[in-house]
Curated annotation (Swiss-Prot):
One of its GO terms (biological process) is sensory perception of sound. It comes from the Eukaryota. Changing residue 28 to T: In BVVLS1; loss of localization to cell membrane; loss of riboflavin transport; does not affect protein abundance. Changing residue 463 to A: Abolishes cell surface localization. Plasma membrane transporter mediating the uptake by cells of the water soluble vitamin B2/riboflavin that plays a key role in biochemical oxidation-reduction reactions of the carbohydrate, lipid, and amino acid metabolism. Humans are unable to synthesize vitamin B2/riboflavin and must obtain it via intestinal absorption. This is Solute carrier family 52, riboflavin transporter, member 3. Residues 24-43, 93-97, 159-220, 314-335, 381-396, 449-469 are extracellular. The keyword Transport applies. It comes from Homo sapiens.
Length: 469
């Protein structure tokens, strides 16, 4: 029974951000098909931030009309909308419309808004729902949330999305007549070498290497259908969770009085969740921990500020510059950093399950350590296309390790802060979700002008780099 509950909670948590994470990992294929090209990530950033209207409305309703807000029907609606939108996405993602003297992916952007609305609102609905379950299930939820990034990345890896190769490109004068390809052709242009060399008065063609994306193993249609299956699994998992006995909704900590012996059970209070039910003491005692939940306003302010800061780094600022910081070291280093940093998220959640530490001092120090790794990643992005140790194996190892440790440290902090707030109240988890979205919004708004307006970062073509020794 316990394994089933952990599995259901994990699948439920996976549905929190699986669709938007899927869009990001599919971008290398989408930018080649849609008219926005490489401006598409900028459009996605704006659309996703506009979707924060969802969590804003939920938070305001909770504050002004708490009695009329129930997260269960909202979650069912979100998961249903997300599943249907993914299915529609699979068939309309490449549909364009003529707007303002040009073709634009209006259907893509509108559907992206609905997917982002689902994922953003999940932060202020999924977490409060988890207050109905014992605390140890919250860690499993964060493991599932980490898998929401890992599973789409693995599907994209199997698809071949984002894989590049170096292609030899030959440039010749416009006056050269259109050649007919023969067996002696250049790799990219199909220009016969014999024909070019035979033309009088012509200079030798110039050749250079460029990065080109490899063809995908299956289309975006299949990818989005797989995303819809993941969302449907999340919907089914939540439905089954609702069908479990009500005794699972009562946290063991809510049933036991800290001031009496472990086997003394206090009477149920009016604000306890669900009717009284039997709880297996052997299971409950194994997860019982000494509470260290801070109650003073200064501690709460520190926790919510740290939640917003950590999510600003992990969701808003650093993802915007990952390609700039890694691609200069080559495609292998980039794919290792991108994949392993995603894997580090659920692994850090698992570590927090077996090695929990609720000390705010420890979490603060770990946040500083993760921020230092993030600072190194940001510095390498600013120095692109010629960062430190470019062309040396040590630089590749450092950038991959830095991204993995950045993701792992801050993921652990996020999980433990959620556990601390869960022990306070359901409202604390809702405000935790609001802080998550606020931090992500501020991070994205800060990076958008730096990347797209001021253009402080320069992209690197690893196949054609000219850096000083």
């Amino acid at each position: 029974m316990a394994f089933l509950m952990h599995l259901l909670v994990c699948v439920f948590g996976m549905g929190s951000w699986v669709t938007i994470n899927g869009l990001w990992v599919e971008l290398p294929l989408l930018v080649m098909e849609l008219p926005e090209g490489w401006y598409l990530p900028s459009y996605l950033t704006v659309v996703i931030q506009l979707a924060n209207i969802g969590p804003l409305l939920v938070t305001l309703l909770h504050h002004f009309r708490p009695s009329c807000l129930s997260e269960v029907p909202i979650i069912f609606t979100l998961l249903g909308v997300g599943t249907v939108t993914c299915i529609i996405f699979a068939f309309l993602w490449n549909m364009t419309s003529w707007v303002l003297d040009g073709h634009h992916s209006i259907a893509f952007l509108v559907l992206t808004f609905f997917l982002a609305l689902v994922d953003c609102t999940s932060s202020v609905t999924f977490l409060p729902f988890m207050s109905r379950l014992p605390t140890y299930y919250l860690t499993t939820f964060f493991v599932g949330e980490g898998l929401s990034g890992l599973l789409p990345a693995l599907v994209a890896l199997a698809q071949g999305s984002g894989l590049t190769t170096c292609v030899n490109v030959t440039e010749i004068s416009d006056s050269v007549p259109s050649p007919v390809p023969t067996r002696e052709t250049d790799i990219a242009q199909g220009v016969p070498r014999a024909l070019v060399s035979a033309l009088p008065g012509m200079e030798a063609p110039l050749s250079h290497l460029e990065s080109r994306y490899l063809p995908a193993h299956f289309s975006p249609l299949v990818f989005f259908l797989l995303l819809s299956i993941m969302m449907a699994c999340c919907l089914v998992a939540f439905f089954v969770l609702q069908r479990q006995p009500r005794c699972w909704e009562a946290s063991v900590e809510d049933l036991l009085n800290d001031q009496v012996t472990l086997h003394s059970i206090r009477p149920r209070e009016e604000n306890d969740l669900g009717p009284a039910g039997t709880v297996d003491s052997s299971q409950g005692q194994g997860y019982l921990e000494e509470k260290a939940a801070p109650c003073c306003p200064a501690h709460l302010a520190f926790i919510y500020t740290l939640v917003a800061f950590v999510n600003a780094l992990t969701n808003g600022m650093l993802p915007s510059v990952q390609t700039y910081s890694c691609l200069s070291y080559g495609p292998v280093a980039y794919h290792l950093a991108a994949t392993l940093s995603i894997v580090a998220n659920p692994l850090a959640s698992l570590v927090s399950m077996f090695l929990p530490n609720r000390s705010l001092l420890f979490l603060g120090v770990l946040s500083v350590l993760g921020t230092c790794f993030g600072g190194y990643n940001m510095a390498m992005a600013v120095m692109s296309p010629c960062p430190l140790l470019q062309g040396h194996w040590g630089g590749e190892v450092l950038i991959v390790a830095s991204w993995v440790l950045f993701s792992g440290c801050l993921s652990y902090v996020k999980v433990m802060l959620g556990v601390v707030l869960r022990d306070l109240s359901r409202s604390a988890l809702l405000w935790c979700g609001a802080a998550v979205q606020l931090g992500s919004l501020l991070g994205a708004l800060l990076m958008f002008p730096l990347v797209n307006v001021l253009r402080l970062f320069s992209s690197a073509d690893f196949c054609n780099l000219h850096c000083p020794a």
